Amino acid sequence: MSFNSLKIGKYVIEKPIVQGGMGVGISWDQLAGNVSKEGGLGVISAVGTGYYKNKEYSKKLVSDRPLSEANFYSPEGFDAIIQSAKAIAGDKPLAANILYAINDYGRVVRDACESGIDIIITGAGLPTNMPEFTEGYPDVALVPIVSSAKALKIICKRWKKRYDRVPDAVVVEGPKSGGHQGFTYEQCKLEENQLENIVGPVVEEAALWGDIPVIAAGGVWDKSDIEDMMSRGARGVQMGTRFIGTYECDAHANLKKVLLDAKKEDIQLMSSPVGYPAQGVRTALTEMVEKREGPAIKCISNCVAPCNRGEEAKVVGFCIADRLSDAYEGNLETGLFFSGTNGYRLNEIITVQELLTKLTEGE
């Protein structure tokens, strides 16, 4: 089957493939700009923008790390990434992924709007007040990520009552995605929570609120997966991990190699200071953390609200900002490498254009 374009708000995405937001520094200007340029929707991760271009946009560093959320989520770094991605994408739409759990969420959303982003995607919590922060930017399309029809219903109810609007699209994410999950450990394993079983109910709920396109995410790997999701009522898919296997992906070569070398059994769920389990690759770091021998936790960047200034990091045994940033810098000893459950299937590095051709025309 050939795929129809995907409409999100006023924006038309020629190929209904959204590249998932991946931070720190995995989906920044090069990856997002090129995905949009080639007809998909490129998504810039807002996480850790203070690390962009060797931390040149961080106004204050402590132990060579951006101090506090003001520098970790650097507005100047974020703006530089967005402008660079726009220069690559031309007049094609571009999105930003901004986690609801971060400190300074509202400010970072405003930063994205002021920098001219077209679409904002938000997961890691229920963004019930998201429209509040985009006031004055009516053209910015808003896309929450949910893991159930119930979550979508709560968001739509709240948005309709408070802001007289509903989401422009919704991403429904199953537990095979990389990074943070919308489920507990136990829930991730349940059959009823697998993507193929949650897409249908979310499509039904979305239809009750108008014409809200549903984008399926979490474990989507190839054209047949996309066709399967479309047959269940999705109008697009979101994919993260597979885009790591592209030349344009902003990730360090070492990060790409970790995935290229990973075996199926290396990819696992782990605890995270964000309060949700996260999916990633077993490495030297995960083994150190299990023995409670991980790197010192200093909470320099104060990145996410649920961590409570390092308290949760001490419970789980690592600082997520520092460890994801180490992965961005290619540190194989102390880096944290997120991946979806299919990450072990990555076996080559190709161009974004080649990948989108494989996804839309088959391999």
Predicted regions and their residues:
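Active-site entrance/lid segments in N-terminal catalytic domains of soluble metabolic enzymes
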Residues: 1-209
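Conserved active-site-proximal phosphate/metal-binding subdomains
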Residues: 18, 177-215, 221-363
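Residue-level detector of alpha-helix initiation sites
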Residues: 26, 220-221
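Short, surface-exposed recognition loops or helix-turn segments adjacent to catalytic cores
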Residues: 130, 216-217
